[in-house]
């Protein structure tokens, strides 16, 4: 159970440091959380890379992507302010296959401006208010992002990129990966 901004940030830092138990954990919010003044670190962010090859996009999943269950229990996370020049931007960085995220509203501002964007060649950045990337096989239901998102590369109000599991030949969605979710900005 998570009830404070400190507990939420601690969870993100454990996942991003490679703690597999944390990455596969089962989390539930017990109250609304205000992130005002918190130096946020997207959940499951480091190592996500996007490769552009002949105008066809493939997602490459990081080992630190969120792979567990996150139940917002109808609560809100407010005050998110995240800006980066070097990595994926969103409340979640990468929601990996088999992960489930549900019943959560996030409010805030997400900005991704890689300083070397034009020099990246085949690499790019992803930015989305709720998640930078959602990988096929993940389930995100009844989640909402209220705020603003700005960036280069693959950018979306709710999610920046819906990408394929690298083990699959093509992107096939057997059932909706993102269901009953909204963006207001």
Residue ranges, per PLM feature:
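Surface-exposed repetitive/solenoidal architectures
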Residues: 1-185
